[in-house]
Structures are given as C-alpha cells and as structure tokens.
Amino acid sequence: IVRVMRKNINDKVFIVFNDEIKYICNIIDNNINRVIVEPFEKVEESNELKTKITVAIPPLKNDKIEYLLQKLTELGVFNIILFNSERNIAKIKADKINSKLKRWDKILKEAAEQSKRNIIPTLSYVNSLQELINTTTNMDYKVVAYEKESHNKNNENLKALLKDDLNNKSIIAVFGSEGGISENEISILT
C-alpha cells in the first residue's frame, strides 16, 4: 500500500476482511513494514454474482493457464478446479503441485484485487475426472462444454438452463483441454 499505491495517512482504501464485506478504511499509520487502517464505512452492495460458478478444466500450458485463471477471476467465478483428463497436454508432476497452486493462488488474489471482488476464488487440484465428479455432486447444475454438442441443432440442454432462475444456485462448467474432451469422458460426465 505504501510503496506501490503510494498511500499516506488519512488516505482512504478499500479493504475486504475475513467476513467478505468491503469497507472503506482510513489509513491511520503507515510505514514500509505495516499499515494500520480504521474502518470508516461499510460498503453494503456486493459485486459478487448471486450464482456460485465453479469451472473445472485440465491444466493448460503455463502461460495459458495463468491468463485463464486471471480472466475467470475477473468474470466472477467462485471456484476453479483443475483436473487431469485423458487428453490434457500439460501434466503437473506430483512434486510440483503445491508450488504451482501457490503461484496460481497469487494470480487469483491479484486478479480479485484488480477487479474489486469481495472474495478470492478457491483453487484446487484433483487427480482424475472421477475425483472431480465425487467432489462436485452437490452442484445444482452441471454443464459440459463439448465440441460435438454444436451438432445438436436444438441445444435444448443449454436453453433449459438459461431459462431457470439461477440466483443462489451453484453451477459447475467442465471444459476440456487443448485436446478436447474424449468420448469416454463425455460418457462418464453425462
């Protein structure tokens, strides 16, 4: 706050505390090592979506996944789950998972700050499609982005979803990697 934003005593900043509520705060003390703020005004409205959206996607090549994580955060996604699929090109080695998740969490935090979100999306990694299914059984709606669905001229599934009231509902959207989703995975998911 002091170095990057060049904020001084009595300047106002937005702070989101653990209660996920945004406050306008006064800086009452600052130095290089710490900043002390005092809540000044509670910001009542939230810019979070009323629908809890989870996106599940296999890891992509490094620069693509980082860009995608940033944009998903800016769009208002609530959870992001990375999973191994049959066709994903980018594989994460078991000993690298924690360091990658830590780096990607930092990207999510920065994107949430930049887009003035009240929360930082959660990021998790599951090792298989079956694990993904097991961890998302409680979702209200499940959507799979499948390239061959465009052959279905009516797209009834998507039309039905978009007609529903999605407020206070949860949706998981599953996407394939650069190689797409295999026929076997589609049969498991549908």
Identify the meaning behind each predicted range.
Residues 46-144:
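RNA substrate-binding interface of SAM-dependent RNA methyltransferases
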Residues 69, 94, 156-157, 185-188:
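Short amphipathic alpha-helical segments
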Residues 3, 187-190:
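Short, intrinsically disordered, charge-balanced linker/junction segments flanking boundaries
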Residues 142-180, 185:
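Active-site/ligand-binding-proximal alpha/beta "capping" segment
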Residues 13, 38, 44-55, 162-170:
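Mobile, glycine- and charge-enriched loop segments
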Residues 1-44:
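N-terminal positively charged helical leader segments and presequences
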Residues 19, 86, 148:
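Residues in the short beta-alpha loop(s) of Rossmann-like NAD(P)-binding domains
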